[in-house]
A protein has these predicted regions:
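Beta-strand/loop nucleic-acid-binding surfaces
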Residues: 34-50
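Right-handed beta-helix
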Residues: 10, 17, 51-57, 63-228
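Short aromatic-glycine-enriched beta-strand elements
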Residues: 20-27
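Short, small-residue-rich loop/turn micro-motifs
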Residues: 29-33
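Asp/Glu-centered strand-loop micro-motifs enriched in Gly/Pro and often flanked by an aromatic residue
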Residues: 1-2, 43-48, 226
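Short coil-to-beta-strand transition motifs
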Residues: 2-10
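Conserved strand-loop elements at the edges of beta-sheets that form or border functional pockets
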Residues: 7, 43, 99
Length: 228
């Protein structure tokens, strides 16, 4: 009867290409086979998981029923330097998934600062969920959207912003500002251009003739233009 090999054995992935796309990898297992030999090991992963290790990754290899003709790779070994720094925490309250190119999904269960972070390792795009709200960052162009409890802010990398609050909308671009709040539209800029067909309107209020002596606050922009 052939020897049976039970338990886990250290292996190294030498080729992760699989024509059938079933997660089979060629591994070397020096403690069982000659060092130059590679054997096809089937994937033994949790249901719904589809992660194939890169070449030269250290993996754990087992054999179905102890039979060396039926190897399985059942997990990866974390050698020094391979652990995601985002998950290097004690106690281990952070769970992370990281791909070879640096794409990262981090679940932080630290009490009081629970959060989820999704990062594009190539372009530095980020989507973060925290107790304060949700933040989306464009890592390539520098734009940003932040949704908090009291406001939503859209920020262009050049400095222009739009802020949405429960009863106000504010837009800023350089020195120009527009604010809509409590039925009032406030425009602050060195030049204000009105669209075609519009005309400057000066509204003094609804005071009657008998109230003409009352003071009426008036704000006049000397740089208002009407576009015909």
């Amino acid at each position: 009867m052939a020897d049976l090999y039970f338990g886990k054995y250290s292996g190294v992935v030498k080729d992760n290409r699989d024509a059938d796309q079933l997660g089979v990898v060629l591994v070397s297992v020096p403690t069982v086979f000659p060092e130059e030999d590679v054997v096809p090991a089937r994937a033994a992963l949790p249901y719904g998981m589809f992660f194939v290790p890169e070449n030269e990754t250290h993996v754990w290899v087992e054999f179905e029923g102890g039979d060396t003709s039926s190897p399985l790779w059942t997990g990866v070994q974390h050698v020094p330097g391979s652990w995601a720094p985002e998950a290097a925490k004690s106690p281990p309250t952070v769970r992370a998934l990281r791909t070879a190119s640096g794409h990262l999904l981090v679940f932080d269960d630290t009490e009081g600062s629970e959060s989820i972070l999704l990062t594009d390792g190539k372009n530095a795009h980020k989507l973060e969920f925290t107790a304060d709200g949700i933040t989306l960052t464009d890592g390539v162009n520098g734009h940003r959207i932040a949704m908090g409890s009291s406001a939503i802010e859209i920020a262009h990398q050049g400095g222009a912003t739009v802020t949405l609050e429960s009863a106000a909308v504010k837009a800023t671009a350089g020195a120009a500002k527009v604010e809509l709040s409590a039925g009032v539209v406030t425009v602050d800029g060195s030049v204000v251009l009105l669209g075609a067909g519009a005309a400057p309107v000066l509204h003094l209020g609804d005071q009657g003739i008998g109230n003409l002596g009352a003071p009426v606050p008036i704000t006049i922009s000397t740089q208002t233009k009407v576009l015909a």
